[in-house]
From Swiss-Prot:
<dbReference type="GO" id="GO:0002486">
    <property type="term" value="P:antigen processing and presentation of endogenous peptide antigen via MHC class I via ER pathway, TAP-independent"/>
</dbReference>
<feature type="region of interest" description="Disordered">
    <location>
        <begin position="338"/>
        <end position="365"/>
    </location>
</feature>
<feature type="compositionally biased region" description="Low complexity">
    <location>
        <begin position="342"/>
        <end position="359"/>
    </location>
</feature>
<feature type="topological domain" description="Extracellular">
    <location>
        <begin position="25"/>
        <end position="308"/>
    </location>
</feature>
<dbReference type="InterPro" id="IPR003006">
    <property type="entry name" value="Ig/MHC_CS"/>
</dbReference>
<keyword id="KW-0472">Membrane</keyword>
<keyword id="KW-0597">Phosphoprotein</keyword>
<dbReference type="GO" id="GO:0030670">
    <property type="term" value="C:phagocytic vesicle membrane"/>
</dbReference>
<feature type="modified residue" description="Phosphoserine">
    <location>
        <position position="356"/>
    </location>
</feature>
<dbReference type="InterPro" id="IPR050208">
    <property type="entry name" value="MHC_class-I_related"/>
</dbReference>
<feature type="topological domain" description="Cytoplasmic">
    <location>
        <begin position="333"/>
        <end position="365"/>
    </location>
</feature>
<feature type="modified residue" description="Phosphoserine">
    <location>
        <position position="352"/>
    </location>
</feature>
<keyword id="KW-0325">Glycoprotein</keyword>
<feature type="transmembrane region" description="Helical">
    <location>
        <begin position="309"/>
        <end position="332"/>
    </location>
</feature>
<dbReference type="InterPro" id="IPR003597">
    <property type="entry name" value="Ig_C1-set"/>
</dbReference>
<keyword id="KW-1015">Disulfide bond</keyword>
<dbReference type="GO" id="GO:0098553">
    <property type="term" value="C:lumenal side of endoplasmic reticulum membrane"/>
</dbReference>
Length: 365
């Protein structure tokens, strides 16, 4: 996404965060795509990435030399040539639909041909711990703003403005929701089960967070206590601060969970405290990989060093993933009681299961 400005990347990231929350004990397969027009520089750039839970497993970039859907996880490499051929054809078809849509939307909004514009899309499905369908979704955005979304009933649409109402009427006339629902409840679920089974050593593992606390004096009267959680998987984690047993939610500075670049995640939460009162504050960490929640308290004798190099490296990788893959920050929710020891059967031997997990459905705006 090198053609995109930093502000656009922030919009993409914030949108992705709003879209990537799942239910406790559930698993998800999601595809994210972005098309960016570049007047005077050829065809729009199209990037698509697929995620199972917190793990990116496929990627396509129209600017890449291969012009192919490429694996991004070891367990997906076992799929045969037909899988890669059909997924490549499907994403290329989506890119051509987006190319037409960029021109159509520019007309809807009475925009000139000079500026660069973006179409974003997220679609996918969730299954419960038993592998059964929970929900499906598709959401589209234009220039970083909501455009149209499939409703929870998978039968109707919500349009964000008058331009999107035009698209809504077109899609209703074409019965697009019905086609999409068939994919979300069928092919998407079959492939998600298949991926969870083939990649279970990675996708169904739990890595407990490595935790510590740091102290930084900001004045003679105040200090910052920062609670760190590093090297954990899956991404869902809760860090909370308490003072004398009372939650300090309003006074807590909390960053989003960030990928560390090695398949694990990192997060911190900080509070400003009066100097000399550090012992009144405790950090509480909850994660699926912990047998019970952890409670941390500042110990002056330990004086740990803030792991600046590791965190900065993680942030750099985080930015690179956003720029290259559109969406890398995630907030999936799964709990140990529903997940540990789970097993998912292979998808049925049907045409969809043998061919492609990318949606075949695409409808012009």
């Amino acid at each position: 996404m090198a053609v995109m400005a930093p502000r656009t990347l922030v919009l993409l990231l914030s949108g992705a965060l709003a879209l990537t929350q799942t239910w406790a004990g559930s698993h998800s397969m999601r595809y994210f795509s972005t098309s960016v027009s570049r007047p005077g520089r050829g065809e729009p750039r199209f990037i698509a990435v697929g995620y199972v839970d917190d793990t990116q497993f496929v990627r396509f970039d129209s600017d890449a030399a291969s012009q192919r859907m490429e694996p991004r996880a070891p367990w997906i490499e076992q799929e045969g040539p037909e899988y890669w051929d059909r997924n490549t054809r499907n994403v290329k078809a989506h890119s051509q639909t987006d190319r037409v849509d960029l021109g159509t939307l520019r007309g809807y909004y009475n925009q000139s041909e000079d500026g660069s514009h973006t179409i974003q899309r997220m679609y996918g499905c969730d299954v419960g711990s038993d592998g059964r369908f929970l929900r499906g979704y598709q959401q589209d955005a234009y220039d970083g703003k909501d455009y149209i979304a499939l409703n929870e009933d998978l039968r109707s649409w919500t349009a964000a403005d008058m331009a999107a109402e035009i698209t809504k009427r077109k899609w209703e006339a074409a019965h697009f929701a019905e086609q999409l629902r068939a994919y979300l409840e069928g092919t998407c679920v079959e492939w998600l089960r298949r991926h969870l089974e083939n990649g279970k050593e990675t996708l169904q593992r739990t890595d407990a967070p490595k935790t510590h606390m740091t102290h930084h004096a900001v004045s003679d009267h105040e200090a910052i206590l920062r609670c760190w959680a590093l090297s954990f998987y899956p991404a869902e984690i809760t860090l909370t601060w308490q003072r004398d047993g009372e939650d300090q939610t309003q006074d807590t500075e909390l960053v989003e969970t960030r990928p560390a670049g090695d398949g694990t995640f990192q997060k911190w939460a900080a509070v400003v405290v009066p100097s000399g009162q550090e012992q009144r504050y405790t950090c509480h960490v909850q994660h699926e990989g912990l047998p019970e929640p952890l409670t941390l308290r500042w110990e002056p004798s330990s004086q740990p060093t803030i792991p600046i190099v590791g965190i900065i490296a993680g942030l750099v990788l985080f930015g690179a993933v956003i720029a290259g893959a559109v969406v890398a920050a995630v907030r999936w929710r799964r709990k140990s009681s529903d997940r540990k020891g789970g097993s998912y059967s292979q998808a049925a031997s049907s045409d969809s299961a043998q061919g492609s997990d990318v949606s075949l459905t695409a409808c012009k705006v």
